[in-house]
Each structure stands twice: as C-alpha cells, then as structure tokens.
A protein has these predicted regions:
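Periplasm-facing N-terminal accessory domains of Gram-negative outer-membrane beta-barrel systems
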Residues: 2-3, 7-10, 15-139, 152, ...
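Periplasmic N-terminal accessory/gating domains of Gram-negative outer-membrane beta-barrel systems
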Residues: 92-114, 118-223, 228, 233, ...
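Transmembrane beta-barrel wall of Gram-negative outer-membrane proteins
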Residues: 255-284, 294-331, 347-369, 539, ...
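Surface-exposed extracellular loop regions of Gram-negative outer-membrane beta-barrel proteins
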Residues: 330-337, 379, 531, 545, ...
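Membrane-embedded beta-barrel scaffold of Gram-negative outer-membrane proteins
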Residues: 370-374, 380-382, 546, 591-644, ...
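C-terminal beta-signal and adjacent terminal beta-strands/loops
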Residues: 727-792, 805-810, 817-869
Length: 869
C-alpha cells in the first residue's frame, strides 16, 4: 500500500513536471469562476462600449463592465451561482439571458444584438434566476447585501455574518456559532484553502470581513471536495483588484459604546493582467469578549488585521493568485463579580498568519488545472495574574501553537451535461501545547469538612487522618491534587505535549445535468494519521428536479463523512492516566486517543420561486454519527479539549425566505429547529461525568427554534438607507442549573455561589440572592429564574425536558448614507448602528461545560464616518 510519505513525494513530482511543462499561470479561484464573451451586431461586427451587467437578485451580487474595442468583456472572481446577464448599447435593442457559473472553468458567451426597433426580442423565463437546480441546500450572500447588515462584533464579524445570514445556525458567545446541531463542526474554504479549525475569537483569529466579496454557506449534504468538518461549509470568495483599472478604496473610522474605536483602509487597483487588493484594520474596545456579567468588567481588547490578495494573469490560459494575511489580537479575560473582588487579571494574545498561493492553467475551453499551497499558523498565549492567588479557583498559563501546511490540486472539466471535478489535498498539522496550572482555592480540594459540611480552608491538614475535633474527612478529597494545591505548599502542574497529524484526501465528483434533472455523484477517500489512525471511503449522492410550470426545485441528498477530531488541545485530551494528577482529575479510567467519527447524513428539501418577488428554500436533515464530538474543560480554566461520545442523532429543519430588491426594499427571514441527542458512554478524550447514567441527553448546543428577520430599505440608489434585524432564540440547554426533582423536596442551591445565582436570575418567592446573601434552599413551588427556563417540579429530563436559557428577542438597527454630498468620484459616508436596541438582559449560556457563563451584548451604539474613492 502506498504510504502518505511516498504519495506526497509522487504528488510533488507530478505537480512539478506539470508546472515545468506548461506556461506560467494567474487567477481562477476554486470558489469562483469567470464569465467572458463578445458582443456583436447582426452582421457579425464587434460592438464596442456596450454595457454588460451580471446580477444575482438573491445574493445581491451585481457587476457591470464596458466592452473593449474588440467587443470583448470579462468578469473575473465570480462566485458560483446563476446570474442574469444583460447588455445595452446605443442604437441596439436590449439583450438579456441567464447564465450559470458552476465551475472554475471560464464560461464563454457570444451575444448578437439586434438593431433598435427590430421585431426580434429576447425573452427570459420568469423566476429562473431566483432558482438553483442544486442538490445541496446553501445560502449565497454578496457584499452588496451584507454591507448593510448590523453586525454585532468587529472582532468576530464573519461569525456574526454567518449567524445572521444562514438558516440553522445557533448563536453562542465570543463569536462561536453552532451549525445544524453540532458543536463548531464548521469549515471555511477561503478561495479554495481549507480551514477546519475553530474560528471563535478565544481559539483563533478570523479573516477580516473587509476581505470578503461573497459567501456561500453550504448547509446541505457536502460535495465530495469537502471533508473533516462539514455541518456548515463556508465558501469565501475574497475581493480582488484584477481588472480594476481605476484605483478604488475607502478609509473609515468609527467610535462607539465601551470606548470602541475602529479604523479601516481598503485599496483595489490593477489592470487586465494584474490586480491587488489590500485591507488593513484596527480596533480597540472595552468589551472584546462576552463577560459572565451584564455589567462589563475587565474586558478590554484590541485587534489588528492585514490582508493582501495579489493576482497576476500573464496569458489567457494562466493565472496566479496569492493570499497573505496577518492578525494579532490581545484581550483580557472578563471578570465575574467574584473574580473582580479578587483582583483577577488574566489576559490572552493570539497571533495568526496565513500564506496561500494558487496557480491555475486552462488547457482548453473545457479543462482547468488548479494547484494551491497554504501555510497557516496560530500562536495562542494565556497569561495569569501577577498574584497567582488572585486567580480563583486555579491559576493558569498557556502557550499553544498550531501550524497547518498543505498542498491541494484539482482538475475541472465541463462539457455537455458533465461538470466534473477531481482533486487531492494533503495537510500536515503540527500541534504544540504547553501549560501549567495550580489550585489556588483552599476549598476546592479540602482535606477536611467542617461540622456543617462546608470545606475547611485551613491549609495545615494534608491527610484525612488529621481531621480531628469537629472536623471530618472530606469524601471528595483527591490526594494526588495535593501536589498542585498552591494553598497547601504545592506547585503548578506542568504539561508539555506535541502532536503530528497528516491527512490525505482524494475525491472525484460529477454534476450531471439532463433536462430538468441534476445528479451529483461523488466519492471521497480520507486517510488520517495523527494521534489516532483511520481511513474511510465516503460516497456523496444527490439529485434535484426542476418543475418548470410551478418554478419549483425538489432535491434529495446523502453524504458519508469522516469527521476528524478537533485540534485544540488534542494532545492533552489524548493523554492516558499514567500521570497521578490527570488520574486524580479525570478518574482512573480515562479514555484513549480520540478517533475520527463516521457520519451518515440525509437531506430533503425544495426551492419555490414566486415570480420575481420571493423565493423559499427549505431543508430537513437527519445525521447519525458514531464518535460524536463535544468539548470539556480542565476544572474551571480556559483549557478546552475535545471529547467523543459513543454516538449522536441530530435532526432538524432550516428555512430561508428571500425577497430580492423591489422598489428599494430587500428582506429575508431565516428559521431553524434542531434536536441534538448524544448517547453515552464517552469513548474518547479525558473523562467527564456527563451522561454517566447511560441515558441519552441534549447537548448544550441544542435549541428548539431560532429565527432572524432582516429588512433593508433604500428609497433611491444614491440616498439614505436603513437596515433592521430581529433575532429570536428559544434558548440553549443549560444543564448546570439546579432544578426541583419533585414537588416536595427543597431545591439545594449551595452548589452555586451567590454571584452564580445572580447570573442565573434565581429567586425563591420574593427573595433574590445578593453577593452577601446567597440562597441556600427553596421550596419547589417558590423556586424560579428570570433568565433560565426551569422544568416544572419532577418534570426534568436530560433528553426531553432539560433546563434551557430563557427565550430572547434582540433587535438591531443601522441607518446610513453612502454618498452624503452626492459626489461622483469621491464620496463620504455616514452610518449609525445600534446593537440590542432594547437593551435586553439575557444569557447565551450558563455554566456550560464548554464555555461557562456569558451574557449577550448590552445596547451598543456606534457611529462610522467613511471616505470612498
């Protein structure tokens, strides 16, 4: 059998010979195509200076260009989608047709105009450009549409954009989102570069939203070219300067609540043969991360971004494209009242750089070869307080690095009914994990208990035999943790780990169009060699049928997916119990290294267009996974690590209703519902007590219903505009809150601190906790919460009726004018944005196993001034 090493050498050799044997190349991305052609008059003569426009009314993409002296036109960097193409020229009748961009192979059209007044007309089928005869559900969003969306966070704008624009996506804290019932099983494909690691701002730095031209969010069965993490595949097409003969750009600055200041600069310039787009931005804010209190304490942060895309096209057949990126973020860990009183001062810094060159060669009008390489590096540092005893209940320092390097190549062939693509991707990921932590709370692992059952914080006893008088031995005492108990003379526990992960993927897929039918046939093979080993063959199948009389598309799809383990702290999660401290923390029977999961997923859906005014896209999915992934934490520290459950069953519906621009009004409505059930036992990662009873449970990213409504109105093209969002979330699972087991037994609340009780909004009758007076017990009939939906006494079920975060309605508003002084070449813009307009006090989560407690953003006001040229 061919090893990964030998295959890689062979692959590099083959690609090298290919490069040497063909002309040098330049710009056709794996996530975009090109539309080229010529405009002729009835005699066959060229028509110069005709205006050619392509437009997708659903995504908002629109672009126009004049024909040159030879009547030719070209649109580069066009996202995969159907488009309405129109041509106008003086003295000629208007022309229109629909074109479908589905491959990186350029689409060539030849247009013959009729003389004005001719009886010959061109007709276009009503509603055609609203529909896509595609087998997988997806959402397309162009910059023209999302530029006016009120986005919540400058430091995680991409997450906010995906959450607000895609159905089936559940919002979580700190830029995290859950796609279709899974925990962060999302991947990005940036101009064809795969990024499958978490992009939450506590793990990594996201690409800047200024760099994005368009998004396609695939929520249906993934095509064969995508693997690893596929609940959502977010295909990003970045902005380009190719063909931009007149330099364009912008300078913007903003100021808002919490002292937030941002500055952004963008520039695009180029010619027919080269182009450059560069973006630089910076932000400083008093609320970088979502805090555990509605009141913001110790949450300052800043971020700097630099993105550069360079394109070079020396010939019609060749193109080269290079993406460069660097982002640095520094931020404080927000404090709770408990941490603030202790003067806790924990901070973190993340540095990310990315280099991704791509070369494309067009062998013929039907065949395109693309070769790409990529190198992405994350360097994460976590820093404790200067006084370690200010960090409660543990003190922690961490240095974590992730380097992902790889090579990808694909061959696209488009002819007749076939749209064929085959490719190979090799990735090598290096993990380095260094951290140390020590216990700083004398009550966390107390040797003795007082007579009333509370922990004895006296540091002197180090053996249960020393518990004398009114003291009694603590049955929960773990002797192995004495070595890291700083309050009893211990020292920090050090961990140093390294991981080496190699992955090889090969795929072939063919989208076959025959009449009103589309068939998607594909197969993917993955070879995973990391801390565990696996190999899987994964068929991908889909079909779609367009019902012309009713403007309806019906679709079915199936995918087998090999899910690879999360890389964040994977080395630590794969430790055995040879170390007494790890054994003391997680038990003597911790699990083996996490293996890749195996998933079968099924989708059924439809699209329905109503003339040119409305399109409804609905999808229902069923996902069955062996080795279902989630995350756990090291005590109460920000060291998160992956775990695996025996299996999971997830099903749910996603709906998007889109209204393209009509008399200045644009709107869309997103709706989603999911059931996310996980089944013990735990089969991978360090131990946890969740699901210890052997019964299924709802994971904490299960949510019954969420919806987003966006309205955008601009009465005339150059006038002011308004954008409005309404977001409703029914609430994530909140399993850590106490509940009434029956109608008579008082609820024991001593497991929560007074601060935690206040965060949860708990009350007992008319009594609410204060920082100095926590609740201890409460009769079931008097017990309740203002921020968490508690099951009725005796009705709690981890599977069917768990506690949940209370439902919330959030409203956002933006108003602006993109051309204040009605300039032509130079324009000034002004906009004002309000996030959480009603200042709703609500939780994202409460004592989540993965992320802890976080509140949604309070009312945030921002004003932005921009200069555009």
């Amino acid at each position: 059998m061919l090893s990964i090493r030998n295959f890689t050498y062979l692959l590099f050799l083959t690609l090298g010979l290919t490069v040497c044997g063909t002309p040098l190349a330049a710009q056709l991305g794996s996530s975009s195509g090109a539309v080229t052609g010529a405009v002729l008059d009835p005699s066959g003569a060229v028509v110069a200076n005709a205006t050619v426009e392509i437009h997708n009314p659903v995504s908002g993409f629109i672009r126009s260009t004049p024909t040159d002296s030879s009547g030719k036109f070209s649109f580069n960097n066009v996202p995969f989608n159907p488009y309405h193409l129109s041509v106008t020229a003086a003295g000629f009748a208007s022309y229109a047709q629909d074109v479908d961009v589905r491959s990186s192979v350029p689409l060539s059209v030849e247009i013959s105009l009729q003389v004005a007044g001719s009886t010959t007309t061109v007709t276009v089928e009503s509603g055609t450009d609203l529909l896509e005869t595609e087998t997988s559900a997806h959402t397309d969003v162009d910059r023209a549409l999302f530029d006016k969306l009120p986005l919540e966070s400058q430091s995680s704008s991409v997450s906010s954009l995906v959450t607000l624009a895609s159905p089936g996506v559940v919002a979580d804290s700190n830029g995290l989102f859950h796609g279709l019932g899974d925990h962060a099983e999302n991947s990005f494909s940036v101009d064809g570069q795969p990024i499958t690691d978490q992009q939450s701002k506590v793990f990594s730095n996201q690409i800047p939203v200024d760099s994005i031209q368009s998004l396609e969010v695939v929520s249906g069965a993934p095509p064969a070219e995508f693997g690893d993490k596929t609940s959502l595949v977010i295909k990003v097409t970045t902005r380009s300067g190719l063909g931009q003969k007149q330099p364009t750009g912008s300078l913007t600055t903003s100021y808002g609540s919490f002292g937030t200041v941002t500055s952004d600069a963008n520039l695009a310039l180029g010619s027919d043969h080269w182009g450059n787009f560069i973006s630089a931005s910076g932000m400083n804010t008093g609320r970088f991360l979502d805090p555990p209190e509605f009141q913001v304490m110790h949450s300052k942060g800043n971020e700097e971004n630099l993105f550069d895309r360079m394109d070079f096209q020396p010939s019609v057949a060749d193109s080269v494209h290079l993406n460069l990126g660097y982002t640095r973020s520094w931020f404080q860990t927000p404090n709770s009242f408990d941490a603030q009183f202790a003067n806790q001062d924990q901070r973190a810094q993340i540095q990310t750089y990315n280099v991704a060159p791509t070369w494309s060669h067009l062998f013929s009008p039907t065949t395109l070869l693309t070769v790409g390489a990529f190198l992405r590096h994350d360097n994460f540092g976590y820093f404790p307080s200067a006084n370690p005893f200010a960090d409660l209940p543990e003190t922690l320092s961490q240095s974590r690095q992730l380097t992902n390097a790889g090579l990808r190549t694909d061959l696209s062939y488009v002819k007749g009914m076939h749209n064929l693509k085959a490719g190979v991707t090799f990735e090598h990921t290096l993990l380095t994990e260094n951290f140390s932590f020590g216990v700083t709370d004398p009550g966390l692992n107390a040797v003795c208990l007082n007579g009333n059952g509370t922990p004895d914080t006296n540091p002197t006893p180090t053996d249960p035999a020393q518990c004398t008088g009114t003291l009694q031995p603590n049955p929960g005492f773990v002797p192995a943790l004495l070595a890291i108990d700083r309050t009893r003379g211990g020292t920090n526990f050090p961990f140093h780990g390294h991981g080496d992960i190699r992955q090889l993927a090969m795929y072939v897929q063919d989208a076959i169009t025959k009449g009103n039918w589309t068939f998607n046939l594909g197969v993917r093979g993955d070879l995973y060699r990391g801390l565990s080993r696996d190999a899987q063959i994964q068929p991908r199948l889909g079909l779609a049928y367009k019902v012309n009389p009713s403007n309806t598309v019906l679709r079915l799809s199936y995918a087998r997916v090999m899910e690879t383990p999360f890389n964040e702290n994977l080395v630590f999660a794969s430790q055995t119990t040879n170390d007494p401290v790890i054994s003391g923390l997680f038990g003597a029977n911790s699990n083996a290294a996490i293996r890749p999961g195996a998933r079968n997923e099924f989708h059924a859906g439809f699209q329905q267009a109503f003339a040119k005014f409305l399109v409804v896209d609905a999808d229902y999915m069923w996902k069955y996974t062996h080795n279902g992934y989630d995350f756990s934490t090291l005590l109460n520290t920000p060291i998160f690590f992956p775990i695996a459950w025996h299996n999971s069953k997830i099903d749910g519906a996603s709906v998007r209703v889109s209204m393209p621009e009509h008399h200045g009004l644009t709107a869309f409505v997103l709706m989603g519902h999911v059931n996310a059930r996980f089944f013990p036992p735990q089969v991978g990662g360090l131990g946890t007590d969740l699901g210890a009873g052997g019964l299924p449970f709802r994971i904490d990213h299960d949510q019954k219903f969420q919806q987003t409504t966006h309205l955008q109105y601009q009465p005339w093209k150059s006038g002011p505009w308004i954008g409005f969002n309404w977001r409703y979330d029914s609430g994530l699972v909140a399993g850590a809150v106490p509940f009434a087991s029956d109608t008579t037994t008082p609820v024991d609340l001593t497991g929560l601190t007074a601060d935690q009780q206040m965060q949860a909004g708990l009350f007992c009758g008319n009594v609410f906790p204060t920082l100095s007076s926590p609740l201890t017990t409460c009769a079931p009939s008097q017990y309740g919460s203002t921020r968490i939906s508690l099951p009725a006494p005796g009705a709690e079920s981890d599977d069917h009726n768990p506690p949940r975060i209370a439902p919330r309605h959030l409203f956002d508003l933006s108003v602006g004018d993109d051309n204040l002084f009605r300039g032509d070449k130079y324009k000034w813009s002004l906009r004002a944005t309000a996030i959480n307009l009603s200042n709703k006090v609500a939780l994202y989560n409460f004592l989540s196993t993965f992320s802890g407690t976080h509140f949604v953003t309070p009312r945030t006001l921002t004003a932005e001034l921009g200069f555009h040229f």
